[in-house]
Protein backbone atom coordinates (compact mmCIF):
# COMPACT_ATOMS: atom_id res chain seq x y z
CA UNK A 1 0.00 0.00 0.00
CA UNK A 2 2.79 2.42 0.91
CA UNK A 3 4.60 1.62 -2.34
CA UNK A 4 1.40 2.43 -4.26
CA UNK A 5 0.99 5.74 -2.39
CA UNK A 6 4.58 6.72 -3.17
CA UNK A 7 4.11 5.85 -6.84
CA UNK A 8 0.94 7.96 -6.97
CA UNK A 9 2.96 10.91 -5.60
CA UNK A 10 5.63 10.36 -8.28
CA UNK A 11 8.10 10.07 -5.41
CA UNK A 12 11.72 10.87 -6.24
CA UNK A 13 14.14 10.68 -3.27
CA UNK A 14 16.39 13.44 -4.65
CA UNK A 15 13.48 15.83 -5.16
CA UNK A 16 11.29 15.11 -2.13
CA UNK A 17 11.76 14.29 1.53
CA UNK A 18 9.07 11.94 2.74
CA UNK A 19 8.96 10.56 6.26
CA UNK A 20 6.87 7.48 6.92
CA UNK A 21 5.51 6.29 10.25
CA UNK A 22 6.37 2.60 10.28
CA UNK A 23 6.29 -0.52 12.42
CA UNK A 24 9.73 -1.39 11.03
CA UNK A 25 11.52 1.87 10.13
CA UNK A 26 14.83 0.30 9.04
CA UNK A 27 13.14 -2.07 6.63
CA UNK A 28 10.88 0.71 5.31
CA UNK A 29 13.88 3.00 4.70
CA UNK A 30 15.88 0.27 2.99
CA UNK A 31 13.05 -1.03 0.82
CA UNK A 32 11.40 2.23 -0.25
CA UNK A 33 14.21 4.80 0.10
CA UNK A 34 12.21 7.08 2.40
CA UNK A 35 12.90 8.40 5.88
CA UNK A 36 10.97 6.50 8.55
CA UNK A 37 10.19 6.80 12.25
CA UNK A 38 8.81 4.15 14.54
CA UNK A 39 5.08 4.33 15.15
CA UNK A 40 5.92 3.52 18.79
CA UNK A 41 8.16 6.61 19.18
CA UNK A 42 5.63 9.31 19.98
CA UNK A 43 8.23 12.08 20.24
CA UNK A 44 9.67 11.34 16.78
CA UNK A 45 6.18 11.18 15.26
CA UNK A 46 5.25 14.51 16.87
CA UNK A 47 8.53 16.10 15.74
CA UNK A 48 8.15 14.92 12.13
CA UNK A 49 4.55 16.11 11.91
CA UNK A 50 5.63 19.49 13.29
CA UNK A 51 8.47 19.74 10.73
CA UNK A 52 6.32 18.70 7.78
CA UNK A 53 4.66 20.79 5.11
CA UNK A 54 1.91 18.25 4.47
CA UNK A 55 0.50 15.27 6.34
CA UNK A 56 -0.96 12.53 4.18
CA UNK A 57 -2.90 9.73 5.87
CA UNK A 58 -3.71 6.57 3.98
CA UNK A 59 -4.47 4.52 2.06
CA UNK A 60 -5.95 1.52 3.68
CA UNK A 61 -8.74 1.14 6.18
CA UNK A 62 -7.18 2.99 9.06
CA UNK A 63 -10.24 4.86 10.32
CA UNK A 64 -12.48 2.11 11.64
CA UNK A 65 -12.95 0.59 15.09
CA UNK A 66 -13.80 -3.00 14.16
CA UNK A 67 -10.16 -4.04 14.47
CA UNK A 68 -9.69 -1.86 17.56
CA UNK A 69 -10.91 1.54 18.68
CA UNK A 70 -7.36 2.20 19.91
CA UNK A 71 -6.00 1.86 16.38
CA UNK A 72 -8.53 4.37 15.03
CA UNK A 73 -7.71 6.80 17.84
CA UNK A 74 -3.99 6.44 17.11
CA UNK A 75 -4.44 7.42 13.47
CA UNK A 76 -6.88 10.21 14.35
CA UNK A 77 -4.36 11.56 16.88
CA UNK A 78 -1.70 11.82 14.16
CA UNK A 79 -4.18 13.63 11.90
CA UNK A 80 -5.08 15.81 14.89
CA UNK A 81 -1.40 16.72 15.35
CA UNK A 82 -1.28 17.93 11.76
CA UNK A 83 -4.39 20.04 12.29
CA UNK A 84 -3.04 21.42 15.59
CA UNK A 85 0.27 22.40 13.96
CA UNK A 86 -1.66 24.02 11.07
CA UNK A 87 -0.26 21.69 8.43
CA UNK A 88 -2.08 20.78 5.26
CA UNK A 89 -3.77 17.45 6.03
CA UNK A 90 -4.82 15.14 3.22
CA UNK A 91 -6.62 11.80 3.53
CA UNK A 92 -5.59 9.68 0.59
CA UNK A 93 -7.54 6.71 -0.77
CA UNK A 94 -8.98 5.79 2.61
CA UNK A 95 -11.52 3.12 3.40
CA UNK A 96 -13.46 4.59 6.34
CA UNK A 97 -15.75 2.83 8.79
CA UNK A 98 -17.46 1.10 10.29
CA UNK A 99 -17.28 2.96 13.58
CA UNK A 100 -19.40 1.28 16.25
CA UNK A 101 -19.10 3.70 19.15
CA UNK A 102 -21.02 6.98 19.27
CA UNK A 103 -18.06 8.82 20.81
CA UNK A 104 -15.78 7.43 18.07
CA UNK A 105 -18.13 8.72 15.36
CA UNK A 106 -18.21 12.14 17.05
CA UNK A 107 -14.39 12.36 17.17
CA UNK A 108 -14.09 11.12 13.58
CA UNK A 109 -16.60 13.73 12.33
CA UNK A 110 -14.87 16.53 14.27
CA UNK A 111 -11.43 15.64 12.89
CA UNK A 112 -12.68 15.12 9.32
CA UNK A 113 -14.30 18.55 9.35
CA UNK A 114 -10.86 20.10 9.94
CA UNK A 115 -8.74 18.36 7.30
CA UNK A 116 -7.92 20.02 3.99
CA UNK A 117 -8.88 17.23 1.58
CA UNK A 118 -10.51 13.81 1.77
CA UNK A 119 -10.39 11.07 -0.85
CA UNK A 120 -11.99 7.69 -0.22
CA UNK A 121 -11.64 4.49 -2.18
CA UNK A 122 -15.21 3.22 -2.05
CA UNK A 123 -18.76 4.54 -2.13
CA UNK A 124 -19.55 3.09 1.31
CA UNK A 125 -16.85 5.26 2.91
CA UNK A 126 -18.14 8.38 1.16
CA UNK A 127 -21.73 7.59 2.22
CA UNK A 128 -20.61 6.86 5.80
CA UNK A 129 -18.82 10.21 6.12
CA UNK A 130 -21.75 12.10 4.58
CA UNK A 131 -24.19 10.39 6.96
CA UNK A 132 -21.83 11.18 9.83
CA UNK A 133 -22.18 14.88 9.03
CA UNK A 134 -18.76 15.60 7.56
CA UNK A 135 -19.08 18.97 5.82
CA UNK A 136 -15.84 18.85 3.81
CA UNK A 137 -16.12 17.78 0.21
CA UNK A 138 -15.33 14.08 -0.13
CA UNK A 139 -13.74 12.88 -3.35
CA UNK A 140 -14.19 9.34 -4.56
CA UNK A 141 -11.05 7.77 -6.03
CA UNK A 142 -9.65 4.34 -6.80
CA UNK A 143 -7.70 2.34 -4.27
CA UNK A 144 -4.06 3.43 -4.41
CA UNK A 145 -2.97 -0.09 -5.35
CA UNK A 146 -4.84 0.23 -8.65
CA UNK A 147 -2.41 2.97 -9.69
CA UNK A 148 0.47 0.49 -9.86
CA UNK A 149 1.73 -0.53 -13.25
CA UNK A 150 1.64 -4.25 -14.02
CA UNK A 151 4.89 -6.16 -14.41
CA UNK A 152 6.08 -6.61 -18.01
CA UNK A 153 4.43 -9.54 -19.83
CA UNK A 154 7.63 -11.59 -20.04
CA UNK A 155 8.15 -11.38 -16.27
CA UNK A 156 4.49 -12.24 -15.65
CA UNK A 157 4.71 -15.26 -17.95
CA UNK A 158 7.87 -16.42 -16.17
CA UNK A 159 6.11 -16.19 -12.79
CA UNK A 160 3.22 -18.26 -14.16
CA UNK A 161 5.61 -20.81 -15.68
CA UNK A 162 7.56 -21.22 -12.42
CA UNK A 163 4.30 -21.83 -10.56
CA UNK A 164 3.01 -24.31 -13.18
CA UNK A 165 0.04 -22.13 -14.10
CA UNK A 166 -1.16 -22.72 -17.67
CA UNK A 167 -1.01 -19.72 -20.00
CA UNK A 168 -3.19 -21.10 -22.80
CA UNK A 169 -6.42 -19.78 -21.23
CA UNK A 170 -7.59 -16.50 -19.74
CA UNK A 171 -6.60 -15.95 -16.11
CA UNK A 172 -7.52 -13.55 -13.37
CA UNK A 173 -5.48 -13.06 -10.21
CA UNK A 174 -7.08 -12.21 -6.91
CA UNK A 175 -5.28 -11.48 -3.67
CA UNK A 176 -7.50 -12.52 -0.77
CA UNK A 177 -7.11 -11.20 2.75
CA UNK A 178 -9.19 -11.90 5.83
CA UNK A 179 -11.25 -8.81 6.72
CA UNK A 180 -13.28 -8.23 9.86
CA UNK A 181 -15.48 -11.25 10.56
CA UNK A 182 -15.40 -12.78 7.09
CA UNK A 183 -14.48 -16.37 6.37
CA UNK A 184 -12.08 -17.07 3.51
Please give the residue ranges for each predicted region:
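Active-site anion-handling motifs in enzyme catalytic cores
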Residues: 1-184
Amino acid sequence: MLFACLRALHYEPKRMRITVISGDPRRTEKTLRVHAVSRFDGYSVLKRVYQSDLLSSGGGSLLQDVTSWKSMMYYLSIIGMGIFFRKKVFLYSQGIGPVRYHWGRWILRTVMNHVDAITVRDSESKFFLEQLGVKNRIYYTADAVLSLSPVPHDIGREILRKNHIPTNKKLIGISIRRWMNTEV
